[in-house]
């Protein structure tokens, strides 16, 4: 009887859950990461335009999305300097959309964003991954204030 009960318990026991575990993104952490990077970054507040159909979809079952998909986009807005978001920015950029297993980064077409754009020579690239951190959709005023404070050398610690 004990064996039957143990067998039934084993059958109904929850299977291991697979989930993506990420540190909650913050503009302060993103600024610190970009500031410490060897590459040059530009912080831009603007409108992101892209072909959303070109974005990878998350995987399911045996079908997994590619680890990296490059998508052309346009970012139109203002980049950050010591005075704030003052420098016009109208550039074609490459979204580098990463997938971690079945989870893929995502952005929406036409969305107002705060983006940490990497500059490589004359080209611009934006990392988009499932954990976030390089692009913030519909940024709140507090986020814009925080990144301006970071740029000016003020307190740049996440809450």
PLM feature segments, named:
Residues 1-4:
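Positively charged n-region of N-terminal signal peptides that target proteins for export
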């Amino acid at each position: 009887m004990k064996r039957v009960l143990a067998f039934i318990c084993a059958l109904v026991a929850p299977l291991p859950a697979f989930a993506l575990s990420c540190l909650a993104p913050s503009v302060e952490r993103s600024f610190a990461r970009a500031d410490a990077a060897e590459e040059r970054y530009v912080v831009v507040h603007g409108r992101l335009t892209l072909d959303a159909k070109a974005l990878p979809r998350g995987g399911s079952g045996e079908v997994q999305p590619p680890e990296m998909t490059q998508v052309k986009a346009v970012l139109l807005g203002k980049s950050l300097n010591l005075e704030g978001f003052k420098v016009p920015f109208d550039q074609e950029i490459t979204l580098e959309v990463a997938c971690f297993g079945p989870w893929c980064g995502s952005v929406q077409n036409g969305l107002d964003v705060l983006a940490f754009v990497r500059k490589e020579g004359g080209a611009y690239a934006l990392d988009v991954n499932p954990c976030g951190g390089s692009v913030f959709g519909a940024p709140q005023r507090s986020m814009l204030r925080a990144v301006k404070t970071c740029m000016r050398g003020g307190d740049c610690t996440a809450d």
